[in-house]
Amino acid sequence: MGVFTFEDQTTSPVAPATLYKAVAKDADTIFPKALPDSFKSVEIVEGNGGPGTIKKISFVEDGETKFVLHKIESIDEANLGYSYSIVGGVALPETAEKITFDSKLSDGPNGGSLIKLSITYHSKGDAPPNEDELKAGKAKSDSLFKAVEAYLLANP
């Protein structure tokens, strides 16, 4: 199995504690409100909401209902850290065993947040991930984040 890690960093005008609460603790209710035409349901398949929990997130894309399996790896409220993996569904390419997202929030400019993100792609073989799949995944992730950010700014 190959392991490939990518680092990213961005800022948000939303305060770190507010943003963390929305994406790590209240995501099951915030995401459907931020994207009401896309998100259909969030269902716990296994676990109690803590590390090890697997959620099935159903959404509409191109007129079809699709899903992704999201596994919570770790929650670090004290340091505003959250880690999850995509372990199944349409967001997991056939060449990947899982894709892990580690995020850490801290104070950013003007009362906002600095978000550090590490994405680790665990491939089934030794081949690196497909560049087009990575770009498409990042674009979807960015648009989801911007929708949540806009929702939080409009609903303080």
Curated annotation (Swiss-Prot):
Cellular-component GO terms for this entry: cytoplasm; nucleus
Xref: CDD domains: Bet_v1-like
InterPro entries: Bet_v_I/MLP, Bet_v_I_allergen, Plant_def-hormone_signal, START-like_dom_sf
Keywords recorded for this protein, A-Z: Pathogenesis-related protein, Plant defense
Gene Ontology BP, a term: abscisic acid-activated signaling pathway
PROSITE patterns: PATHOGENESIS_BETVI (PS00451)
tRNA-binding is among the record's keywords: no
Induction remark: By fungal elicitor.
Chain ranges passing through the membrane: none
GO molecular function, one term: protein phosphatase inhibitor activity
One Pfam family here: Bet_v_1
Origin superkingdom: Eukaryota
Family: Belongs to the BetVI family.
The protein, known as: Pathogenesis-related protein 1
Organism: Phaseolus vulgaris
